[in-house]
């Protein structure tokens, strides 16, 4: 996950 809480690419 990234800083936004979204799954990382």
UniProtKB/Swiss-Prot annotation:
Q: Which UniProt keywords apply?
A: Cell wall, Secreted
**Taxonomic path:** Eukaryota, Viridiplantae, Streptophyta, Embryophyta, Tracheophyta
Record's GO cellular component, any one? Answer: extracellular region
Localization recorded for this chain is:
Secreted, Cell wall
Listed name of the protein: Unknown protein 1
**What is the species of this protein?**
Cycas revoluta (Sago palm)
Identify the domain of life.
Eukaryota
Reply yes or no: does the keyword Secreted apply: yes
Chief place of localization: secreted
